[in-house]
Amino acid sequence: NDTDPDRELYPEYAGDWWLVNSMIKESQLFFADLVVNNRPASGLIDSDYTFLDERLARHYGVDGLQGPVFKRTKLPQESPYGGILTQASVLKVTANGTVTSPVLRGVYVLERLLGYHPSPPPPSVPAVEPDIRGAATIRELLAKHREDPSCASCHAKIDPPGFALESFDVMGRWRDNYRSLGEGSKRIAGLGRSGNEFVHYIGSAVDSSGRMYKGEAFDGINEFKKLLLQDKEVIARNLVHQL
């Protein structure tokens, strides 16, 4: 699977099928609850509850659940989770297992949640390849990419949602720093879940701030959600089109 976590960078996830299955189940239960109980479409962006079992609760940093049975769980007030937008299943499939991609995640938010479809990139423009050695951040690489006038207008819309989600790793867990295979402030080595030896480094701090294409600034996922929720009609209309 192209989105399975890299065993060098994320050895703690190797073979964790309980987590993977729980991620899928959460999304199924949450969306069914949204539709069956006629809850507002804004719940796709943010909600004060989700459905968790012990493994997924631990992944999200939520205490108090034991065992494999899913329960409707109220999230802590300042939790970055809540809504489809920040569910681990979505965050996993919008990464490639090695690095997160603000572009993939940004396009997902625009297309699936807001109903806006960015134009495909010009064939002459190469894709942005993240630097897993840690020498340059994805934000720096995208800034250089936007210097091309043919890329700037679309990336002004795509990049901000992706930046807001950068505080979540390739499996949707909260992080404060990137990991790299080459450079960083701290070397981490050991044996992974599958018994493989690994070495990686704690890299630069994550920056999840940004500015929407209309000019509104945000610092982190919760402020970004509030900006999206200023236009609930767009979210509701797009949900109807998706069903």
State the predicted function of each range.
Residues 1-241:
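Active-site substrate-binding loop specific to GH73 endo-beta-N-acetylglucosaminidase modules
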